Design a protein with these regions (language model features):
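Glycine-rich, mobile lid/loop segments that gate access to catalytic sites or pores
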Residues: 117-158
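General beta-strand structural signal in soluble alpha/beta enzymes
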Residues: 80-82, 103, 109-114, 135-139, ...
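Generic N-terminal amphipathic, Lys/Arg-enriched alpha-helix
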Residues: 1-20
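Active-site cofactor/substrate anionic-group-binding motifs, chiefly glycine-
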Residues: 45-102
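Glycine-rich and polybasic anion-binding loops at the starts of cofactor/ligand-binding domains
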Residues: 92-130
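N-terminal glycine-rich anion-binding loops that anchor highly charged ligand groups
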Residues: 2-5, 22-48, 62-73
Length: 183
């Protein structure tokens, strides 16, 4: 097996994405995200996904030049309509909007729709951690679990992401007691 430097792999991924029409900034974000995820050892959501993305971009089920739309629905809520583009781009935009709202109003909750596979959740929670905020990222997946007594798959195993790079202190005082937990 040949070992390839992350920087070389990143350049190659970006070039591949640009060749199928992905604009440079989005190609750079997706290429960096896929390579970083592989570097973390999450290969199922890393560079391994590139051929899947390229195939879908080529046949048009992911739109290379989609222009996502952000609709602010309240002071701490918004929705990103991805226009059927690259999920990593939309999820990062959603986290950036959530960070902005959290700085302004104390919280930010953003949903993403009309998108595609969004990669590893850790990409987005780390963005929140770098902004010195708590970030929670969730997504859906296909039905894979049959409920007890059932006959067909109904439940999914949605991946959730959290990041604990920064020290986190959770305090939950109640009317009867005070509790604090250091994570």
């Amino acid at each position: 097996m040949e070992i390839v430097a992350a920087s070389t792999l990143r350049r190659w991924a970006v070039e591949c994405l640009q060749r199928v029409g992905v604009p440079s900034p989005e190609a750079a974000l997706v290429g960096e995200s896929l390579v970083q995820t592989s570097v973390w050892g999450i290969d199922s959501h890393g560079v391994l996904r590139l051929t899947h993305y390229l195939r879908r971009l080529t046949i048009g089920s992911i739109k290379a030049s989609a222009a996502p739309v952000v609709l602010r629905t309240g002071p701490v809520t918004a929705q990103v309509h991805g226009e059927d583009g690259l999920g990593i781009v939309h999820a990062m935009l959603a986290m950036e909007v959530a960070i902005e709202m959290a700085r302004e109003n104390g919280a930010g909750i953003v949903g993403v729709g009309h998108s595609s596979h969004c990669g590893a959740m850790q990409l987005y929670t780390r963005a929140a951690a770098r902004a010195h905020l708590v970030g929670i990222a969730m997504t859906h997946s296909s039905s894979v679990v049959i409920p007890h007594g059932g006959r067909t798959k109904y439940f999914c195993l949605p991946p959730n992401g959290t990041t604990t790079e920064l020290e986190c202190v959770i305090a939950m005082p109640t009317s009867r007691s005070r509790a604090a937990m250091r994570v």
